[in-house]
Amino acid sequence: MSSPDGGYASDDQFHGNCSVPIMMGQYEWTDPLTMFQDAKTKKEAGSANSRGKAEARIRRPMNAFMVWAKDERKRLAQQNPDLHNAELSKMLGKSWKSLTLASKRPFVKEAERLRVQHIQDYPDYKYRPRRKKQVKREEEGFLPSADIPGPQVMGCNAMVGQNYKMQYSGQNSQQSQITPAGYFEDHNPVGFYYRGYNVPKYYMSQNSSGYCSPPTQGEYQALSYNFNSSYIPYQQNASAPAMGKQMAVKENIIQESPEHGIMGCQVSPQMYNGQMYVPECAKTHPVAQTEQHSSLHQSQQMVTQNYLPSQQDGHLESDIDKTEFDQYLMYEPKSDTELIYTIDQDSGAYSTNLLPSLISEANSVCYYDYCGV
């Protein structure tokens, strides 16, 4: 016989000791409505705090224009609902400027009354404008770009000044100090064109481990073709009998024409790294020294004016080593007097036929080294 409840009561009694109701009773259930109400109250509290902060800020008293524009703006906004607020402000400014002083007087009086009232209400008020946050811009310094190699990459040009100073400091105690490492990188026009090419390291300096670019034609002219003096004893010992006759002729030539030289330069007074170069003939003849003293002083001034136009050029010439560029030449180095004058054994005349060959050979060295041949 079936029960009136369809057997649900018996099932509830049978499952009365089920663990599910016991487990569910251990947790605290929260109503979703209460959660929503709590969030709403927090939001209202935050808005109240912000409103309190806004109300705490004391507004400035209105001036005459603000008093007049307070009602005039509303009227223009009703007449022109499509206009932007900025356009309304422009129209208000133009119309205020067009008003006469008599029409502005009531608004000026009202603004003065508001100012006095504001002072009475807020005696400690001080106008503090809200400054706009300015983004601190970092100072753009001179940073080395990725295209320009640093002193570590351009090892030769960075160490050229130091090598010049170290090799020639014993001969000249009054030289300038060592130039900075990046000086030749900024003033060497050849290194700029070499930086994009993989030039083979054919020419290596004896005192530096980096690649040295060959000098240009202007640098050869700045050297005045003065080479290492260490080769002179070897040449004198090797060809002493032949040199005896030539030196006598050379001394006569120099005495007869002391101001004749190649490329318009004086032969007897030559400047090498800030020093006066006096030929051997002037040293061997004491009488000639007193006669040539005045001419040496005048020629030194001429050389300084013509070939040392600025202190920077003189600084460059003082850093040039006379022995650095021997490795780029394909012929036997000679002394200064031999380079200046080539003696003809038969006629006894002198010529400067060696100069064009030197210039052409220097240009060929620079060209082939630049092309990487």
Curated annotation (Swiss-Prot):
Main location: nucleus
Swiss-Prot/TrEMBL keywords: Activator, Developmental protein, DNA-binding, Gastrulation, Nucleus, Transcription, Transcription regulation, Wnt signaling pathway
Motif 9aaTAD positions after renumbering to this chain: 323-331
The keyword DNA-binding belongs to this UniProt entry's keyword annotation: yes
Location of the DNA-binding region in this protein: 58-126
UniProt xrefs under InterPro entries: HMG_box_dom, HMG_box_dom_sf, Sox_C, SRY-related_HMG-box_TF-like
Limits of the Sox C-terminal domain: 256-373
Domain notes: The 9aaTAD motif is a transactivation domain present in a large number of yeast and animal transcription factors.
Biological role: Transcription activator. Doesn't appear to bind to the consensus 5'-AACAAT-3' DNA binding site, but binds 5'-ATTGTT-3'. All of the sox17 proteins are required for embryonic endoderm development and gastrulation movements, and show some redundancy in function. In addition, the sox17 proteins have distinct but overlapping roles in later gut development. Acts downstream of vegt-signaling in endoderm differentiation to induce a range of endodermal genes both directly and indirectly. Also represses wnt-responsive genes to inhibit wnt/beta-catenin-mediated signaling.
Protein name: Transcription factor Sox-17-beta.2
